Regions:
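N-terminal Rossmann-like NAD(P)+-binding subdomain of aldehyde/semialdehyde dehydrogenases
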Residues: 2-157, 204, 342, 360
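Short, well-ordered beta-strand elements within core beta-sheets of diverse protein domains
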Residues: 39, 51-58, 74-78, 153, ...
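Catalytic strand-loop segment that frames the active site of acyl-thioester-processing enzymes
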Residues: 546-606, 691-693
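Conserved C-terminal structural/oligomerization subdomain of aldehyde/semialdehyde dehydrogenase
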Residues: 48-54, 87, 223-226, 245-248, ...
Length: 694
């Protein structure tokens, strides 16, 4: 039996949150509360039922809120580059890390254990750091993001095309679920902020007071520009009425609510961008090789218990369907039950020793129990746990014990259609891998599925079979069981979302999430026009010669600054010496007969790396100066072979200049082109250097 702890009188209930006043909204760069006589919705402590706060937005002018974001927010964010915004996010993450203990105490009132709070609070802060870092590494220090290579549209190079991303000119409105009041806000705020789009946050009412506390700290930090962030505490029913094609709505919640919002005329006809991440019947497939006693079986059971109890099962990524080989059901049920009894203590998360708290509200508890009843009516049988109120817990709390149901018929519609959004999962059996794939797909589109197997062929078959039905698939075996971030934990580097029932959208995914808040546009024109618009030099655009560009500091250097070097004649002795010095004696460089038989070479040819090395000697200015180091080489392509007697020359042009906001130097990307004596292109590549700002 699981240990059940009640809320003792000596338990710390965290900081005082007076419910005498309504949780405020933050709009138009000031705090706002409704009139004192407003009828506000009561929000209760998830463990005790005591009133924590009251919430209302009656009287709030949402049209003015949207207009403030489009004007003040757009203007202030538009003054910054991607890197400058990313630096502010990093500072914000550092600031919030210093106040998280206060947030932990408040989070406990939502029913979250300390581990749950870490996932929510630290996880949200982690998104700020990750996206800040990736933006500074993968995006230019400008306001235009280039997508892909230039497309030549004329024979003479005078007309070309390029795809670019620029920020949408409106507002990013996030409508969030109750389960992650911190992470849910920050994981949407971060990419919008880097893109340069102001955000309006509408948290879920049951836990919105925690979101408000985070926003209050964000504002106290003084880090964000004016208009960058607004908060609506309470209803925002007519918010979409004030949006159009310039704006984006990012919704997290139920599929039913998502359908209602998607059907709004401003979405259907007005072009409001709408993304949704909704409920999902995620699965965990136990491979046929993962028998009881294997590391994969143990890891599978541990993952199931974690996902059923973390946040009391109130995660859109929680495991809802256990899909196991025929004949393994009883073994899995026994193992899950044993681990649950040994590891899980249900109670008030402020009490010592508690590992699983209540649901977020009694209303949510009632919905979960109603869903369990529907699962039973659909053919499920409870094989672990009970729908009875757990003994020893506060009757005013929203407690539900973990429940595992078994379905004799794996094709039962209920198990693939009904989600009990709490500590509830169902187990079904499959006959073979094809059957497992079919069952996983019956979820109608899911956020994530785990595949527990150590057999590469089984993993490949299952993943290729289910990938198109999922946003993420986690491979679990003995190698990564300890290092895995877990089935239920989206990471900011990878996409979070899924097709079909899961919402049909994406969040996170590194820089992909930033681009969701931007418009991709194809621009066409001459090289000079493309260079002026993108800030990156395009071949054929104007160049400047004279002073060697290596003698210019970052402040003096401009895209289009160019130097040329050469020619230098290649001899057979040079090729032979390079082969001896490097050990690269590939026959094309050393055996005349074999080289001549190669369809790509006329005979002995120079090593490509010999030519690149010579090119550096031809374009470099060797004396000490602003250029501090060569940091790399990218996009190297060898085009025309070079034979003994040929000559090469190099043209080096400043292509892209990226100042580093926190350093006294920046990165310069140089366009390098090698030609032979016939003006044929021998090689093309980008040279990366670090250059002092002054």
């Amino acid at each position: 039996m699981m240990t059940l702890l009640s809320n003792g009188t000596s338990t710390d209930t965290g900081p005082d949150t007076s419910s005498d006043t309504v949780v405020p909204s933050y709009v138009l760069d000031s705090w706002w509360t409704p009139d004192t006589d407003v009828v506000a919705q009561r929000v209760l402590d998830a463990s005790t039922g005591a009133e924590v706060a009251r919430v209302s937005s009656d009287g709030l002018d949402l049209a003015a809120v949207v207009e403030h974001a489009r004007t003040v927010g757009q203007a202030s964010l538009g003054e910054l580059t991607f890197h400058q915004r990313a630096i502010l996010l990093k500072k914000l993450g550092q600031y919030l890390g210093g106040v998280k203990e206060e947030l932990y105490a408040l989070s406990a009132r939502t029913g979250a254990t300390r581990y749950d709070s870490m996932v929510d609070i630290d996880g949200g802060i982690g998104v700020l750091f990750t996206l800040s870092s990736k933006a500074r590494r993968e995006m230019p220090n400008s306001q235009v993001y280039i997508d892909g290579d230039v497309e030549a549209l004329s024979r003479d190079g005078s007309f070309s095309g390029q795809h670019i991303y620029t920020r949408i000119p409106g507002v990013a409105c996030q409508i969030n679920a109750f389960n992650f009041p911190v992470w849910g806000m920050l994981e949407k705020l971060a990419p919008a902020f880097i893109a340069g789009v102001p955000t309006i946050v509408k948290p879920a009412t049951p836990t919105g007071y925690l979101t408000e506390a985070v926003v209050r700290h964000i504002l106290a930090s003084g880090i964000l520009p004016l208009g960058a962030l607004q908060l609506i505490s309470g209803s925002a029913r007519d918010l979409i009425d004030h949006l159009d094609y310039r704006d984006l709505v990012a919704f997290t919640g139920s599929a039913g609510t998502a359908r209602t919002l998607k059907s709004h005329p401003n979405v259907v006809e007005g072009g409001v961008r709408f993304t949704s991440e909704t409920d999902s019947l995620n699965a965990a497939i136990l491979g046929p090789d993962a028998a009881a006693g294997t590391a994969e079986f143990d890891a599978y059971v541990a993952s199931v218990v974690t996902e059923m109890t973390s946040k009391a099962g109130q995660k859109c990524t929680s495991i809802r369907r256990l899909i196991v080989p025929a004949g393994r059901r009883d073994q899995v049920v026994a193992a899950v039950s044993e681990r649950m009894a040994r590891r899980v203590t249900l109670g008030d998360p402020r009490a010592e020793g508690v590992t699983m708290g209540p649901l977020a509200s009694t209303g949510q508890r009632d919905e979960v129990l109603a869903s369990v009843a529907r699962l039973i009516d659909g053919g499920g049988r409870i094989v672990m746990g009970s729908v009875d109120a757990p003994t020893g817990t506060d009757p005013g709390g929203a407690f539900v014990a973990p429940i595992l149901l078994a379905f004799h018929d794996p094709e039962s519609p209920a198990v693939h259609e009904i989600e009990a959004f709490g500590p509830v999962a169902s187990i079904i059996e499959y006959t073979d891998l094809d059957h497992a794939i079919v069952l996983a797909a019956r979820g109608g589109g899911s956020l994530v599925t785990t595949v527990a197997t150590h057999h590469p062929d089984i993993a490949r078959t299952l993943v290729l079979g289910i990938a198109a039905h999922h946003g993420r698939v986690l491979m679990l075996d003995r190698v990564d069981a300890r290092s895995s971030t877990g089935h239920g934990s989206p990471v900011p580097h990878l996409v979070h979302g899924g097709p079909g029932r899961a919402g049909g959208s994406e969040e996170l995914g590194g820089i992909r999430s930033v681009l969701h808040h931007m418009q991709r546009t194809a621009i066409q024109g001459s090289p000079d026009m493309l260079t002026a618009i993108t800030g990156e030099w395009h071949a054929g655009a104007a160049v400047r010669t004279g002073i060697h560009p290596f003698r210019k500091s970052l402040a003096e250097l401009r895209v289009g600054d160019q130097t040329q070097g050469g020619p230098r004649v290649v001899t057979l002795a040079d090729i032979t010496a390079f082969a001896e010095a490097t050990g690269d004696k590939f026959y094309a460089h050393t055996d005349p007969e074999a080289a001549a038989a190669n369809p790509f070479f006329p005979g002995i040819v120079a090593h490509g790396y010999l030519l690149v090395s010579w090119a550096a000697g031809l374009f470099v200015d060797a004396a000490p100066g602003p250029v501090l180091a060569n940091s790399g080489l990218e996009k190297l392509r060898f085009v025309t072979p070079v034979s003994p007697g040929d000559s090469i020359r190099v043209t080096l042009t400043a292509k892209r200049i990226t100042p580093r906001e926190t350093e006294e130097y920046g990165e310069v990307c140089w366009d390098a082109v090698l030609h032979n004596q016939n003006d044929e292109v021998v090689a093309t590549y980008d040279v990366l250097t670090l250059v002092a700002k002054e």
